[in-house]
Amino acid sequence: INCRYNYFSTLNLTGLTELFEIDCSNNMVLNELYVPDSNKLKTIYFENTGLTSIDLTHSPILNWVYGGFNASLQSVFLKGSPFVIYHLNQSPNLQYFCVDESKVVTAQNYVTQLGYNCVVNSYCSFQSGSEIYNIEGNSVFDSTNTSCNTGGTGVPNMKVQISSGTQSAVLTANNLGEYAISVGQGMQTLTPLLENPSYFNVSPTTQTVSFPATTSPFTQNFCVTPNGVHQDLEVAIIPTTPARPGFDAFYKLLIKNKGNIQQSGSVTFTYNDAVLDYLSANPLATTQATGTMTW
C-alpha cells in the first residue's frame, strides 16, 4: 500500500494482513500508525512523519524498516523480527529502541554512531513520552559466606530476568557481574537465573521495585554462595570458521567451571596431524607434540 504525501493523522491498517509493503512516508501530520499482525509484511517506510512511536513487534518476517527523518519519533518496538535491517537516521529524539536480545549490542552501536541518547534493550515496557528509570547492580560470588558485602568475585555473564505484567526479558551481566537496564514506570520484578540452581544459594531470590515511587537509579546486588560441594567442569571446542581443504580453520577451546568450587588441572587438545597443520595458538600451549597441545 502506498499512501505517501497524504494528510492522514491516523492510519489504521490492522485488518490488512496480506500486505507485504507499507509506505506512508512524507506525511507530516501522521501521529498514529497501526500496523497489521502479519506474517507477510516485509518492508515498511515511515520517513518524514509526525509519529512519536511505532510498534512493529507483530511482523516477524520484516526485512526492511525505513524510519529516518522523524523529528518527533521517540520509541521504536522491533522485537520479534530477527532478520531486519533498519534505517533510523535523522531522528535525533529517539529515546527507546526495543529489539531482540541477540540484536541489542548491534542496535546500541548503531544509535551510538548516530549520536542518539537512546536506550536499547529487549524489554518492551517503555511507553512513548514516559519517564525513563534505571536499574543497576552486580552479582558477587562469596565462596566463604563472608565477603559479599566487602568484596567477593563478580559472577561473569550471570543472567537476571526482569518482568512487568506480560513483558519479560533476560539481562546478561558483563565480565565483572555488572548489569543495568532502563525501564518505564510501574512494578518491575528482578529474578537471578543460574544454569545449575541446585549448586548455589542466591540472596535475594527475587526483588520487586516500583517506579516512580522508588528513586532512580535503583541498585540491586545479588550474593551467590555455594550450596554443598559440586565439581562440574565443561570443555568444548567451537569452530569459528568452516573447515575447508587448503584454507585456514579457526577454533575456540572453552573451559568453563560450572560447579561451585575452584578447580585446577590441564586440558589437552588432540587433532589429526595427517590432515591438519598447526599454525598458532593463543595463549601458547604449555606442551606440544605431534597432534596434541596441552595447557
Model regions: which residues?
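Leucine-rich solenoid repeat scaffolds
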Residues: 71-129
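Conserved hydrophobic position(s) of the canonical leucine-rich repeat
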Residues: 8, 19-20, 30, 41, ...
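Short beta-strand elements of extracellular/lumenal beta-sandwich folds
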Residues: 236-265
